């Protein structure tokens, strides 16, 4: 695993950029109402990531897209914010997506060190932790093998993998195999 520089995007600006592309006025209003709750969750993420205990977040149930996650925002709405407003090439959040992809030195996957970066991995999966779907500190450039291999499991104490933005330098100097 290789450490990479943590993104320097303000989470509030990224959230606002993504929500600015929403065409449905009712949905945009609901995201605006949920904004302080999402920003509080983003702050909690940074605190937990610094302490290496992201496993402490409660995961959403598997497959229930209507589950309310934050304020009155459903799991599907939070996941769609990422896919519709950050991944889509014509949307405002795409600039942040592209900048995150460029964080991997030489375009190499920080998880395996071999594969070419081709996607962003949600460190806490968007299907289980959708509140963090557009949080740049949760989005790691990765190769498709590492992204799909990690899957969407629920983190538990003792099973949390290394986080490329939050690990100490020692991870790059100690042989792992």
Go through each PLM region and give its residues.
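Glycine- and acidic-residue-rich phosphate-binding/metal-coordinating active-site segment common to enzymes
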Residues: 116-177
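Short low-complexity stretches enriched in small and charged residues
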Residues: 63-68, 94-104
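N-terminal accessory alpha/beta regions
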Residues: 2-90
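Short Cys/His-rich Zn2+-coordinating modules
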Residues: 85-98, 121-128
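Generic hydrophobic, aliphatic-rich segments that mediate packing or membrane embedding
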Residues: 74, 78, 93-96, 105-108
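Short, glycine/acidic-rich beta->alpha junctions
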Residues: 92, 101, 131-135
